């Protein structure tokens, strides 16, 4: 497996330009670029400059993060490119195909009320419909879609089994998974990752690795993520399960922790690398 850095870790204290330099220095193999930080880059730089960086450095781009689906999206045969989600998708495809990034993270619909109370089967069917359309739009760009289950109660796709049903129903070779250790844990404190063994292994396009604080259910959220090595997520079991499945791809550290955002980007990226590398080495997952 290869080490990767997701820009969410230093979102509020860094820039894409800084992240590129610091990730190269730290030793990361890949970087996951955030769309908001990509737009920040494009204010003063060009896509060709980003392409040139990756052509002349060891660090390479992986998935672009992220496009958020919503119920009723893409109602017509042709996409509405004024739709903010489709603008994100188009930017990810345009830039990704230019710089050598072949993946975009896709997040299922999240209920703005905080709790999904709809019909689960209908919601899964809607995800299948949207993903099928996005797969067609992505194909000319050579992009693959990494569908990410979210274990929070506001999500309509909370489990590995649900995500697997959707990806199998889509049945497109450019639609697969990104498995995120904390998003799996968020579904009823799940530290049993054995369901990953039941998915099509070739469909695991990306992996996100992190742990999280031990807090009451009412306080659980993405801001409680922390680097591997402490916390309540059994990251060892997660990595060992992926290894059993034959996964050898990238493992990207992704946190949304305000405490980290108050640090320097140097501190964040150095610690992100050391903890991720240590976790992979401990579980004999390094290539």
What is each residue range found by the language model?
Residues 32, 63, 105, 146, ...:
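Conserved beta-strand positions in the central sheet of alpha/beta enzyme cores
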Residues 41-45, 68-87, 109-123, 218-226, ...:
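Surface-exposed, active-site-proximal loop segments in enzymatic domains
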Residues 6-10, 34-38, 66-69, 109-111, ...:
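Active-site beta-loop-alpha junctions enriched in small/polar residues
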Residues 1-4, 9, 13-27, 100, ...:
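Histidine-acidic metal/acid-base catalytic patches
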Residues 14-17, 55-56, 74-176:
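Active-site acidic/histidine proton-transfer and metal-coordination neighborhood
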Residues 46-58, 130-137, 195-198, 237-241:
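Catalytic-core regions built around general acid/base machinery
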Residues 32-55, 111-115:
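Glycine-rich, proline-tolerant flexible connector loops at the mouths of alpha/beta enzymes
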Residues 29-30, 60, 102, 144, ...:
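Residue-level detector of anion-binding/catalytic polar loops
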């Amino acid at each position: 497996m290869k080490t990767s850095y997701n820009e969410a870790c230093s979102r509020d204290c860094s820039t894409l330009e800084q992240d590129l330099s610091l990730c190269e220095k730290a030793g990361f193999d890949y970087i996951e670029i955030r769309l908001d930080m990509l737009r920040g880059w494009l204010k003063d730089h060009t896509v060709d400059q980003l392409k040139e960086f990756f052509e002349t450095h060891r660090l390479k781009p992986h998935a672009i993060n992220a496009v958020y689906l919503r119920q009723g999206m893409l109602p017509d045969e042709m996409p509405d490119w004024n739709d903010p989600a489709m603008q994100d998708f188009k930017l990810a495809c345009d830039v990704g195909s230019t710089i050598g990034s072949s993946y975009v993270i896709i997040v299922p619909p999240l209920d703005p009320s905080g709790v999904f109370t709809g019909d689960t089967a209908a919601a899964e069917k809607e995800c299948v419909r949207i993903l099928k359309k996005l797969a067609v739009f992505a194909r000319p760009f050579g992009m693959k879609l990494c569908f990410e289950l979210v274990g929070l109660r506001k999500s309509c796709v909370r489990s590995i089994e649900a995500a697997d049903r959707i990806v199998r129903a889509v049945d497109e070779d450019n639609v697969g998974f990104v498995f995120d250790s904390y998003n799996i844990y968020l579904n009823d404190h799940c530290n049993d990752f054995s369901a990953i063994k039941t998915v099509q292994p070739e469909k695991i396009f990306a992996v996100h690795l992190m742990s999280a604080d031990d807090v009451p259910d009412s306080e659980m959220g993405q801001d409680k993520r922390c680097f591997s090595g402490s916390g309540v997520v059994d990251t060892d079991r997660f990595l060992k399960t992926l290894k059993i499945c034959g996964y050898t791809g990238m493992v990207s550290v992704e946190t949304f922790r305000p405490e980290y955002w108050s640090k320097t980007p140097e501190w964040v990226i150095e610690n992100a690398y050391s903890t991720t590398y240590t976790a992979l080495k401990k579980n004999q997952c390094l290539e």
